[in-house]
Amino acid sequence: MTREHALKNAIAYFDDGHFLDDLKRRVAIKTESQIYESRKADMTEYMDEMIKTFQELGYETEVFENPNSKAGPIFFGSRHENSNNKTVLTYGHGDVIRGQEERWEPDLVPWELKVKNNKIYGRGTADNKGQHTVNIGALKSILETRGCLGFNSKILIETGEESGSPGLADFARQQKELLASDVLISSDGPRLQPERPTLFLSLIHI
């Protein structure tokens, strides 16, 4: 199987509506970390969504309690294929800012995915549920094409980024070996131009 086959599978994931179906399901979960105490059940639901999704892709999964008792759980997934392979750690966050329903247009609801004027609306579509849904789709397309990734994959999805990532630094220190990798891909950050993807090749103090 070739790179072209993998790209064809990835494009089909978007064109056949499966991407929107997956994203719709995730957007509907109200993971507002700024009011975490009232959203604990939603955070658990999102962790369950990640567990199911990644186990279907052959990952071992685990949900960790946050070292900060006032912050949400942390999801970790791992797919180890070969000790000689490089390991890629991918970061994302499942939490969103508050819905702020009163600030949305009358025909839009933050927890309901809607395509309008060729744009996708819903809380988390741009930050960050959309991004890690894209990443999941890419991993799936590779696995469907050749049955393996060709690298070892680790996934970290926190639920407190919109509140300053409480507990994440402590978690990283405690789980240094678990998170050890050769490459970090963090699909979260600013975009310099709306119509053009922005790629940062190196960052310090991560």
Where are these regions (language model features)?
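Acidic/histidine-rich catalytic neighborhood of metal-dependent amide-processing enzymes
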Residues: 128-202
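Acidic/His- and Gly-rich active-site-bordering loop/insert found
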Residues: 2-123, 142-151
